[in-house]
């Protein structure tokens, strides 16, 4: 059945989990015209979630589906234009749903931050999804919408100004307040590191800057592109003089998503596009020391985890980390915030900065970004790109999602610096 004639515009799968509940709240508050259903393993838990969502959601149908029973996923996907999924770790639970959406031509969006899940989705399902017309959109939360859309904003502005193509482009996390990590995030990191520590080929792939570009020979040779660089701020932009930056833990994932966006769009950002991510560590007397220390710790933890995580007793890991389904309190979510700034220099020497900021914590923001992605896919279909297959937020939804994000409380914009 054509997606436009299906029973639901959006099915939210995983609605009873921590991120799923937050996403359901955003969808209920959106007051959109979308036909929405909630899905998960337990009808009783789904009813309990729906009861807390307010009057707009009380008529939303409930669907029982389980990743361990692929036929239920395919039946669910066949009823929807769009499936949003918060069920992770995606490395463990995600591929059956990707397969179901690829087979049924259903658009899909997730919150993954797991490189090998992304690579496996591309290798196994990109061609079929492209053939059936499905958009399988990876990383529609804090990983990696801010990274991906900041570069897309810059690309769009540079095209408007006719100032060439993007060259050196650097994201800096300028401010960030996050006081708790969810059990789901820990489980995802653990699963990702378990995969690479058990599989030498997976380890090789995640250390390649172009992990998510399957035609590796088509990528330009731009020399080393370290995942966790440290810089004087002035090396990135004069506006950052006096600041120091260091390794950003999510850079290894986000940078690959951004590079895939460039490749999917026929390298429209530029063939000399070099991209990195760091976090600001301030401009105090201790900032240079903090830059070196943080970068060493982040690079060491990720590198050692990717190689040796399988040697840690799983029971010990589970005992000392947050439980699945847990996350920061409502009060903590409200106190959080973040601001990303992305600086670029073009082939003509013009300089720009893009901003992406949200005045809530990363988890509440993630839910809002996923909900906005779902509404964009369901309601703004005439503004989506023509691309199909396993895609990225910018390549699939760039302009349409940028237009919708301010209504979710996101502050975005570009500034020409010189």
Curated annotation (Swiss-Prot):
Q: Which GO terms describe its biological process?
A: glycolipid biosynthetic process
One GO term in the molecular function aspect is: oxidoreductase activity
Presence of keyword Phosphoprotein = no
GO cellular component annotations, sorted alphabetically? plasma membrane
Listed InterPro entries: NAD(P)-bd_dom_sf, Saccharopine_DH-like_oxidrdct, Sacchrp_dh_NADP-bd
Catalytic class of the enzyme: oxidoreductase
Q: Of which family is this protein a member?
A: Belongs to the saccharopine dehydrogenase family. Enoyl reductase subfamily.
Q: Which domain of life is it from?
A: Bacteria
Q: What is this protein called?
A: Trans-acting enoyl reductase
Q: Which PANTHER family match?
A: SACCHAROPINE DEHYDROGENASE-LIKE OXIDOREDUCTASE
**Pfam families from the UniProt entry:** Sacchrp_dh_NADP (PF03435)
> What's the EC number here?
1.3.1.-
* Assigned keywords, A-Z: Lipid biosynthesis, Lipid metabolism, Oxidoreductase
